[in-house]
Amino acid sequence: MRVVIALGGNALLRRGEAMTADTQRRNARIAAQAIAPLAADHEIVITHGNGPQVGLLALQGAAYKPEEAYPLDVLGAETEGMIGYMLEQELGNLLPFEQPLATLLTMVEVDADDPGFQNPTKFVGPVYDQAEADRIRTEKGWVFKQDGEKWRRVVASPVPKRIFEIRPVRWLLEQRTIVICAGGGGIPTMYEKGANRKLSLEAVIDKDLCSGLLARELNADLLIMATDAETVCLDWGKPSQKAIHRARPDDLTQFSFPAGSMGPKVDAACHFARSGNRTAAIGSLADIAGLVRGERGTIINGGFAALGWH
């Protein structure tokens, strides 16, 4: 099977962990250990989040003069290289030398008139208490929103329209290469109006929506949204909580899921499952082999007879 694996933001940096290279390296190793056993039987494409990493780079860059600070699109490209390098090396340490791996910088087309630019919603960077967030807001002009009990920076999150590097990804897959691409949702890019020239924008594309687009453009058989939750649940955190095992896209669209966490994953999974009656899975990275077999997590396919529970 051709499988696209979207690693959640916790894959390289869990909430509360220090944003050090050693921490991210350790978590990359854990992700590689989960994914490597699939390589013998499947074509693998890996995407990943980059919110904490790109936010940290932006904060570091804010120490420079305004004209010296790098924009978010450049920072996103930096994180694609950094995270891809760690994942690629850790996978290479587990797989035979003959198994090719490649990390690909990925530009993704967006619409400059996307309404997302008028209402920033995408969390990036570390968490702050309110006093610290207020101080940075005053100094840097950043927009902050509450994330649980803490505060995080938010930026625009336009909808991805097209992946510019989709042909190189296909070429690499034809050679049985494990491809790491579209990190952090890819680099937001648009054509300059009236000209055949690409421009990049200060924004962050939702990694789940981009992963779904990538899976559709690659005609993948399975899209896996690997997260820190074992399943999609109804009434999360309540006594009435129920874990969904199997569902059709229409079963899930009748429910409401948190916009900042499970919501985009469910939306992307349902959109993919509707395209050609394909299968999507949402679950824990540790259960990834069970997700491929359809035994663990939440499996989404239009052919199921009814909603099923764990």
Curated annotation (Swiss-Prot):
- Tell me which EC number(s) this protein carries: 2.7.2.2
Might you report a single GO cellular component term? cytosol
- Superkingdom is Bacteria
CDD domains associated with the record: AAK_CK
Coiled-coil positions are none
Checking Pfam families in the record gives: AA_kinase
* Catalysed conversion reaction: hydrogencarbonate + NH4(+) + ATP = carbamoyl phosphate + ADP + H2O + H(+)
Which Gene Ontology molecular function entries are recorded, alphabetically? ATP binding; carbamate kinase activity
Q: Copy the pathway line from the protein's UniProt record.
A: Amino-acid degradation; L-arginine degradation via ADI pathway
Q: Where in the cell is it found?
A: Cytoplasm
Instruction: Tell me a GO biological process for this protein.
Output: arginine deiminase pathway
Report keywords, A-Z: Arginine metabolism, ATP-binding, Cytoplasm, Kinase, Nucleotide-binding, Transferase
UniProt similarity note: Belongs to the carbamate kinase family.
Q: Which NCBIfam families match?
A: arcC (TIGR00746), PRK12354.1 (NF009008)
- Name of the protein in its database record: Carbamate kinase
Q: Which organism is it from?
A: Rhizobium etli
Name the gene that codes for it.
arcC
